[in-house]
């Protein structure tokens, strides 16, 4: 699954279309990557609905009804708002600092991190702008398959 902010959709509309054409989930990460608990309720709704509306306008595709709050910051109020407007909020169970394109951890770090922290039911947070992730992904997936892991979409998990 990919969780996108508006700027990514603006910068990469063809790539977003490709994500959808290939069957990937494209979820909501707000228009402007705001801190949800510090944002008033009206603006929380706008950040989510405006981002979804923009994706539809820019790509012709609907955004999937999954939401990942920026930085994982939430409150009971913001969780309720996202639920009320029809989104399933998704968090992660393992992550590392991969979002700074000028300070990448390296592919060996990524591979070792997965070996150390992977667990059944894991939802890794992997930023798609990371060169280290791109370089390590094939090895990580191959290693996990050898260990008996299988991969499922968020839609599969939601079905239970």
Model-derived features: where do they sit?
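Active-site beta->alpha N-cap acidic-glycine motif
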Residues: 1-39, 43-64, 143, 156-160
């Amino acid at each position: 699954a990919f969780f996108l902010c508006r700027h990514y959709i603006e910068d990469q509309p063809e790539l977003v279309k490709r994500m959808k054409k290939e069957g990937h989930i494209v979820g909501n990460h707000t228009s402007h990557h705001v801190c949800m608990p510090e944002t008033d309720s009206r603006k929380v709704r706008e950040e989510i609905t405006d981002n979804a509306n923009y994706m539809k306008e820019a790509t012709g595709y609907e955004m999937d009804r999954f939401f990942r709050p920026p930085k994982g910051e939430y409150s009971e109020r913001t969780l309720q708002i996202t639920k009320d407007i029809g989104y399933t909020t998704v968090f992660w169970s393992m992550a590392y600092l991969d979002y700074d394109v000028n300070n990448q951890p390296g592919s060996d770090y990524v591979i070792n991190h997965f070996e150390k922290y992977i667990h059944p039911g894991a939802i890794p947070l992997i930023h798609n702008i990371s060169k280290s992730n791109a370089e390590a992904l094939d090895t990580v997936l191959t290693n996990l398959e050898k260990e008996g892991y299988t991969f499922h979409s968020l839609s599969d998990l939601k079905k239970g």
